[in-house]
Amino acid sequence: MEIPVSQWCGQGRGLCGHRHCQEEGDQEMKKFVLMFCLWPMLALAEIEHARDLMEENRFEEAMQELWPAARSGNADAEELIGVMYAMGLGVERDDVRAFEWYLRSAMKGHPGAQSGVGWYYEIGRGLPAPDLVRAYTWYVLSAIGGDPDAAISQEEVVKKMTAEQIEKAHELIDDYRVWLFPFR
């Protein structure tokens, strides 16, 4: 005779309703919740350690610290790797890779990376040509995200733009803003 899962008492996961199973299940849940809460702090500690390494000019070690977090989608790590490629810190300077890493981070709402994307579009380095519409777009998004320097960059770029370009940029800003900053 098969015992229904609701009455099963073999794994201590609290499935059967017995007190000892519920207590063991509660302990497992507490461990899970604790790890869930601590995981971001561990990632933050790794990022801060990488920043410290960068300040000590230990760029290769910093890259080793950042790489797993960046590959897992951490926007701070992605932005720092973008900085490293943009400036040739511990890696050969590569504007295309720098832009790609900045863009990954920017699409997750990282204001510093958004300014980096704006700068690359403004200058056109590593890109086929400058694109003032997209430069302005990313500077505005960066300012919305809280980068205090982005407003200055935005003011400089808008001086070089036509009314038509500004209008197109505002269309893009409206498109991105809803997605990147749904509560602002």
Regions found by a protein language model. Name each.
Residues 40-42:
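N-terminal signal peptide c-region/cleavage motif recognized by signal peptidases
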Residues 25, 29-32:
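Positively charged n-region of N-terminal signal peptides that target proteins for export
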Residues 5, 11-15, 20, 149-184:
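Terminal, low-structured helical/coil segments at or just beyond the last alpha-helical repeat
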Residues 47-53, 65, 69, 80-87, ...:
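Hydrophobic face of amphipathic alpha-helices that form TPR/SEL1-like repeat modules
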Residues 8, 12, 58, 71-74, ...:
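Short helix-capping/linker turns of helical repeat alpha-solenoids
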